């Protein structure tokens, strides 16, 4: 049998030949200890050249491809490939793992880099987005992540001279990144004209924002900031692969084989051409270079490492070499010397010295080499080639002996016979040829038995036989030398084989897994002397087995290091070493063999540490020495805890059923009942599959769990309190070291762990997101700060948490088999143990990972199943209890001894100050001394020892003990049978709590007149429970079979019980003794009922689909009810005892008459009229509403009606207990629901007086007692029930503003489309017509006239070089709220419009701007904490949440200096609609516009997301932290108010409860304010304000406003509250009100705006002033004393602002907009001077040349002329029906041109007076008119139209001018056209969907500004006829800039916004002289 166990010898990696030079760069460095660190295959290597020694880091599970050295040069980071690749940070000195970073990248990790102080690490993934990720590597935590680039990234580096900046480069790009908050923002490097767009391969950062980079063409590109400033051409002749910066300068290495050294300013120092040196060769390519002092390390493509001493740079020293690229298959060992020969597809054959660890010979062949062999005397070396030939060389000097090619396909294997006379050659064409060595390798035979390619050969010792393996796994034998096949097994039996390298054969059966027919083992080699076998497989694993190993699935030891397939493995000639070669990693590994006898001395070579386990996990088999599992444990391991439907699935399921629900809920439904129930007592304790889940709290209460309830039991008062935060079975529980907090873990799809306070029963933290299916074990650390947990997913994941923060610290896969226990080391918080099935593992934390080592059992014991574990009195000592009753004692990871403790498993153990206590399946509690040597005392749990005060009865003696705990002078014991007992130290035992044992519980009956109930269960017991305050089990009786139903007779004397075998019995209700029993049915009895009154009949329903009716007195069956098509589920009698109502499994509701059982058909209307004695039916019209929307996945299993017929209680498959008002007609009734049971509620019953409800949990085995709190009965705290699932269908109220805000869809700037309905080909895509007069360059013709009349500029035409934002007229009030705040004691106000945050000085009106947002700002808040003064947070729109630059984001910035402090990229798709700071100012809350309206909490300074959760399915308008809290906040929205708590990383919410106020309905809530003592005020759509105490509505302030209350503000200093609403101004009312702290008294303020309705969107209160923002884009300051209003900011109410005109001589301008106003603005005074209400939307506006008249064009086709002086109308006219798009006075003031969307321009002669008769018009315009310009002489008009065409017309005739030459000679008075050759350059490449909307040329005629649909203002030179002209661009507007103009003297540019209704004034910066 020993053959099946793992061998007891061992391999230790001694040397690796090779270095990974292919496909990697920059992977070779000097460490601080002057050692060399690099990697090969899956191993990190630290090589000491001085001692010629290697150390290995083996924490990776696949190929390493990237490496970075920490700045202190001791720590190394390496990254690997794989599906779930990870990064290891390890110590190059000890080669131990320091940290593991995982769970972020996929595919692989391409680049790594540490920052300057080594705190952060950046990594780049190999995924399609090439994700860039920044880590806090010590904590294993990701700080930020962003998509890197669409193509490969080759190098990344931190800028060591600027904080938070990085540079990355790769295919055709270089990117400069800045890290702020959690946002990584890239800027692409601009190649410009300086250099070609190139692939950049490597880079290094220098001072002064300089970056040096190496390009693919061999140039070095030098960058300043993001711009390329120069190139150093021809630095190398080909691509520069590596660049290394050091103190002296830079070293570069390239594909040309050269190393160049540069000084710090990148001036060349020297060049070293490696190809020219002694060791060089053609094609040498440098992949890595490292320069330290006078040494340079070089790594090459062909896996060499050179060291160069700078002084002797032509003599490089070769310190490592390996095979080059190409698969490596050939391996042979020398028969007499310690040499190994390898041959590869790189065509080289190499001989290695195993003693000196060096390459001693190398020879290049013509063909790739696939196999090798050395003959017995060591003279000849044969090589098999890929082309079918083989070559024989002399080993001595590598000269050729012979070259033979007999085959066309690859030679896979060749071997010399032991006597040296023959050579056997196996080929891919399935033949083996035999050659005679002495006859100069003449072919002497061939073996042709195989049908597939030959894989392995072995000779017999006498050279007479050959055995082969082929690709089909067949093993064949041949006689030598002829090659005749041997088929007789007898002949072969006696053959002794000289070597064993075959993979199939009896002797190696054990190397294959038991049930597998795969052929992934590539090579084996037998060591006959050591009786071991080594194998190599496709997964990079080397295994040691015993030899021979005859039975499949033998145990082994495994060793990792190779990354992919290991192609060959051989013992050295003296069996000292094993040599293995990697196919893809081209590496040669040399392992030292340590035989068994040496192991004793070498305990230090305990299993080496690695993330992949080096011990034989998979090699489990039915080993004889593993005891069979104990039945109890066996049962437990079969529990999967999987659910068909998890509670988490309900929201999605409901979503799917939405349509069904909508149709049903259109009808008004009954309210939920007024009654509520409260959980009062639970009979039950979960012992059957849990351990150590029972503890004393600080104050001596007992805490444990059952079902989904955490129970705190007070044993003095016999009362319980409950933690009801879980929604499914709790599987584990542990107590905090201070005994006040408890952690419980539950079942779930994403199961949670709750940490809660046993005193307040409030959750402190909820941990989730890292387990699946359930959490099976938890444990606190000794300091109470950390928590370890284990999941029940397939890998039994182990997680270490910082539970207060709710953060995962580390995670690892635990084991394939179930883990029962996790324990944290009390002395070292970074260590823990897990124990479970055949498993004991010792873990330590390494960054984000955990490194586990299996307990080392040695010869002492066997690999047993561990059920419990504790730590001893030092950090090394641990103790575990096994399934066989032993206690194992461990030191470090070694088993030192075992002690027999119990018969059967040890389920629980506990460490005391001076010893231990253990409990086992044998029902004995044992006390031990502190070294487990003596058992001091035992207590047997027996009925005899029960003390008189016990609350129940022991079911049996010596029940299996599952939990033990000590405290308060007692031992607390929990048993498998669901009992909790207290053992006094002196011996007596008190039973405290008990419940049913394992097995479903269905039967429940309440007594007709006493507070007792009976239950019967599959555990084969019938029990009677006392429901009065003594809460105990009164009687119990064992049954021969389990039962599913029971019933008391009406007089309470008899109890009928239905059993599962089809029998039933009647028992005496007091003594439980049998009265009578019957067995008439085969299937289980499902319901049993006595008829009412005297109880004359007994109805017995069974799963056979029959109901039998018995006469109780005569004990005879009198009737059978037939006709049901399925099993019976419920029966009820009518009050007369004549009629039975029956429910069946097919959802039939049937009626039968007693006693004969005749079927009756009763119409449903009649059913209601029948008086029923009981109602437990779940079918029928009266209870239609109890079926949930998701009825398909969940059944309602039970119901029970109160005796007053008012309230129906139901229980369902999801564990919900619900109360409905009866009758529940109509679908989906409203209810109150309660969670406590975990899964199926199998039965519910009211007690005889309806004072209590008793419910049974089917699989949680618990009996719960609830008290019924009648309507009208009001206790201090209403019960927490969850309200109905369906959102209230009451109308939440209507208001146009609210509806618009709710339905608005925000588009991001990048996706914006054109605002005008343009058609046609864009100008830059049109074919250009050849101009007629392409004049010769020299010409006598007169010069072309000016394009533009340039006036009032004089001689100095200075171009404009920049625009600076100076003023904004506008405020976003239309769909935002609470976005105007005071700063600096009211001197400044802060608000926003478009994408700009505005700081506005109240006194001077001057503004400064925050312009870092790249899209519209939607919300703004100010931090109120004095530590964070003037800190503002703003949230913006965005598109999807891929964390790229267009993702929605929040900026936190300083309002005074506009510095960005943090940027938070959000996962809220669409945008961020609300932000709020917490009381300490450190947390920020944000709400998204995504469909789930996600709520997220951030630690904004670190950019860390703490918690996130779906908020509500409808729009949330505002969420705000309570001003005194960092954990409590409130959200309001459409028909929604929720009260939230942040617990760790979890967000818990409670819906606002309305039930306490009559007629309260859930309205749409719009605003929030707070008061003391947990008061919250919410403003509603109707104008009421709701007042909430905690989460319960306690008062309504009716009509606080007459319209929606949009804004509320809580003043922190005095608690007064400001509200703002939507109202018509009236004498007593006002749109703004100031209230006292409790919203009882108020003072109203009127806003004197002159509007018909004031709609307030934002309020804020300063010192004596109230700041108000309105829907009309006004910001008003109201004095509290005098109520005086001062308007600070004006803006247009609705946009777009199409019309814009600047005054001809003054700094005024006019704007006209959709809101029907024209406004006059003064730039110098920074204010609005005047506004005219036109009553219709205005589209265009224009000043006359003198500035005395204004023309306005309207949307309805009318135009108006006003006199500026009086604003009186001079004239108006309407000749068109459609909008006027542009209107112009001619320069001589004679004509007015009016362009409209009717494709026409009308001319009016103004000299004819205000009658305004049209004198002519332009026809034939192909599309609507956009802009018009007059010529300087008023004779021509240029018109641009909606089909991208420009036309010129004569004035006033309207004739179309076609002559290009004539047009070219016109001088224009103004230029606002976006069309024409002169402005072709303004059209950008990216304008497929978007247009340039407006343009304006400066008065100087040399500058041009444009506005476009992306919201950009651009500055060009004029004219700009070249396509895609250079320009500067200015952001700030929302999408669509609709108009733009220069003011007089070109002092300013004014731009008008479409979506943002704002006017931006930009100051022009002219070029200095």
UniProtKB/Swiss-Prot annotation:
Pfam families: Beta-prop_EML, Beta-prop_EML_2, HELP. GO terms for cellular component: cytoplasm; extracellular exosome; microtubule. Transmembrane segments: none annotated. WD repeats lie at residues 59-100, 104-145, 148-187, 195-233, 235-273, 280-321, 323-362, 406-445, 449-488, 561-601, 725-766, 770-811, 814-853, 861-900, 901-940, 996-1035, 1038-1077, 1080-1120, 1236-1276, 1412-1463, 1467-1508, 1511-1550, 1560-1598, 1600-1646, 1691-1731, 1733-1774, 1775-1814, 1887-1926, 1932-1969. Residues 619-633, 1281-1294 have a biased composition (Acidic residues). Residues 1326-1337 have a biased composition (Basic and acidic residues). Keywords: Cytoplasm, Cytoskeleton, Microtubule, Repeat, WD repeat. One of its GO terms (molecular function) is microtubule binding. Gene3D superfamilies: YVTN repeat-like/Quinoprotein amine dehydrogenase. It is found in: Cytoplasm, Cytoskeleton. The keyword Repeat applies. Coiled coil: none annotated. It comes from the Eukaryota. May modify the assembly dynamics of microtubules, such that microtubules are slightly longer, but more dynamic. PANTHER family: ECHINODERM MICROTUBULE-ASSOCIATED PROTEIN-LIKE 5 (PTHR13720:SF16), WD-40 REPEAT PROTEIN (PTHR13720). Belongs to the WD repeat EMAP family. This is Echinoderm microtubule-associated protein-like 5.
